[in-house]
Amino acid sequence: MSPKLRRTIACGQRVAAAGVFACLAAGTFPGSAFAQEAMLRANNQVWVDAGVQQLHYWEDIGPGKSDSERGNTAAFSLGASTQRQLFGVSNLYFSGAVRVAHGNVDYGGYLQGITGQVVQPNYQMTTRSTTTDVTLKAGKAFPLHLGTWNAQVIPYVSYSYHDWIRDSSRDPYGFYERYRHHVIGGGLMGQLEVTPKLVATADVRAGAMVGSSMTLAGSQNTFTLGNKPVIVAGFGLDYAVARNFHVNATYEWSRFQYGRSDVTQVAPGSSAYEPDSKTINQTWMIGVGYAF
């Protein structure tokens, strides 16, 4: 572990005599602080990933009125993380990632007349879906040992931004909608050194949705949606092919809801509302990273 990197774990800085003795004693066992280099390498890294995101969106409207989007799209992400000492505090953890998923999904819905009656209950078309997710995390790692296994837990606070473009405008009865929201929350990440080169990570977080909205192309107003809790969980593996070259695989599951909007004017003499909806996204990614 290079001292100039200033990354620390349990024995990372000058401490009182009792603390030094504890660190020296820990170093005599297989689960020593130094042995946690694998997690430090995994957490001090920049990476690029590619994979698949499965979208499942549906609206709760009423009997005979279904409105949903479902399908798989190509996903790409870029991210970076670091675990180090900062301002005299050891094992601070920071990460940031941007992910974009784009592709065609299947719309299942209905057509209605001017008075709102259903004129075609099962209408199918193709939607171009583009989702953008930005996630930032800040926390502190607490190293521990599970028998002879090296591990650590990282409680953190988080911010995320979600943007979904729902574009079926190529269809004669299609539309163009853009959904957006922010999430402020926190979570807990657990990491385990499976081998000196392989690190497994489990992560779960939840947060409060803020500023959710939907913009409809051609409308003179934006629909203000109801804010609901957001839950995200995931699992990942990071393998050090070489000291600085890593490969990774991740899975993430997320669920959120939008509450019904107020009746909103979309054109002179015409108003509408956005119904309650639910979204479940599942994302599988593989990629490469550079550990520093």
Where are these predicted regions, by residue range?
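Short glycine/proline- and aromatic-enriched beta-strand/turn motifs that initiate or cap beta-hairpins
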Residues: 34-108, 278, 283-285, 289-292
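Short loop/turn motifs that connect adjacent beta-strands in outer-membrane beta-barrel proteins
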Residues: 35-44, 83-94, 142-153, 194-200, ...
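Residues that define the transmembrane beta-barrel architecture of outer-membrane proteins
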Residues: 42-44, 70-76, 126-134, 151, ...
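Transmembrane beta-barrel strands of outer-membrane/channel proteins
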Residues: 46-54, 94-102, 155-161, 190, ...
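Extracellular loop and loop/strand-boundary signature of outer-membrane beta-barrel proteins
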Residues: 58-70, 117-127, 169-177, 213-226, ...
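Residues on the lipid-exposed face of transmembrane beta-strands in outer-membrane beta-barrel proteins
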Residues: 76-84, 134-142, 157-159, 186-192, ...
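Outer-membrane pore/translocation modules
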Residues: 99-187
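Predominantly the C-terminal beta-signal and adjacent terminal strand-loop region
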Residues: 222-292
